[in-house]
């Protein structure tokens, strides 16, 4: 609308967008790369893959897209092709009205929105994201789930998939005696070198490289959170009898994965917050503004967890969720939320330098509101 020449329009637009695009892309890329600190290869590998994708997107947006827009001209915006008239049309529309409402009652606006988000965030602690068994991942009752429930009804839950302890051959009896009374244990027996045939002598214990395996049957489903809670005590007792004992099997693997996810939540999230604060501080030239913006995004993150808790746990009644969910939700929600803040605040700063803080904020909101909403 403001420029008759599409080249002049592109020059003005490019000057205004390259900095926030680089800043937002860098923020998301660095946030994803922080996943490399994860103890799980499945999580760590996602970091560089996602970061490479973001960098490629930035290159495309800053090079290929402008070239295509210049090549094809205004008709590419059909059916609402912009025509040159010299007027600034951005101060009209829905977001202009929203901006005027906020301008009239700024205190009421932030109190209402902040209170609403806090109410949603208050439900976040009720979110069940401490792990979930395989049978609980189904919303229906397939044959495998029916079979597992039948097994748990008539036999120990871990009958078909025992926990295994690798021990020194001369420590079999000591370890067996140590773990047989552990919580959740229903049966302990060494792995035999052959099949048990009625009326025939029992096969010898299978020993390989002076190591033997002891099968420990638990009374709960092997992939359940409850079975995993028994693993630390079993490990403690086994190692009290054999310091080289190693406890493995499905229950142990699931427990270790949940432990690693918990550690990732406690380390990666704070590192991400620190890095994002630095990037925002450099972009906005103000650490206070960066902390304020980060606070709004963190509040929206906890509000999102609260909504998830209300919907998944209290409305649909799901058994729970993977304990890696909070980390992935944080990385993507906070990274995207910071993106939107960068788009908004970059334009607000630009407009504030021209027309003052208050009208600059309203102009920035009006210009970026539709873009943020559609994104």
Can you say where each PLM-predicted feature lies in the sequence?
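Membrane-embedded transmembrane helical bundles of large multi-pass transporters/channels
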Residues: 1-129, 240-375
